Regions:
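Charged, low-complexity intrinsically disordered segments
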Residues: 1-144
Length: 144
């Protein structure tokens, strides 16, 4: 198996049979609720409602800058927000410890989604133990 490294954490390239996987790409399709972009599951964090998991994830990147978090909250479209706040101009304002926090923060955000939304828990239950994959690549043979 090939080794990849993302944020200092080794990952492996794996192959799955079609019947072993639940994949999602678009929020309006069957498994779209698994996407961080899904507005079906707003999250309450520290008394603030974040429209999507992506909004809360991005807010974590800039937690030392409440003015940026406020800007993130003004954008309803999660994909636009993600693209906007991943630009180079914002890089100096990202938490200096973000590389080590981004995966634990994402786990926390996903746990909030699970805890706060019974319908998300039901969606997860419908996967029947299958591997859940975000179809975020254009590689030939990766689309279900």
């Amino acid at each position: 198996m090939a080794q990849l490294v993302y944020s200092g954490i080794p990952a492996t390239i794996r192959s799955f049979r079609y019947d072993e996987v639940v994949s999602f790409c678009e929020v309006r399709k069957t498994w779209g609720g698994f996407s961080n972009m899904s507005s079906e599951y707003p999250l309450l964090y520290n008394g603030v409602i974040y429209p999507t998991a992506e909004h809360l994830y991005l807010a974590g990147r800039f937690s030392a800058h409440p003015e940026i978090v406020a800007m993130i909250l003004t954008h309803r479209n999660a994909m636009y927000c993600k693209r906007l706040f991943h630009g180079r101009a914002w890089a100096p304002l990202i938490r200096p410890d973000w590389a080590g926090l981004q995966l634990p923060w994402m786990r926390y955000v996903l746990n909030l989604k699970y805890e706060q939304h019974p319908s998300f828990r039901r969606l997860l239950g419908q996967t029947a133990g299958k591997v859940i994959l975000e179809d975020s690549t254009m590689l030939v043979g990766t689309n279900p």
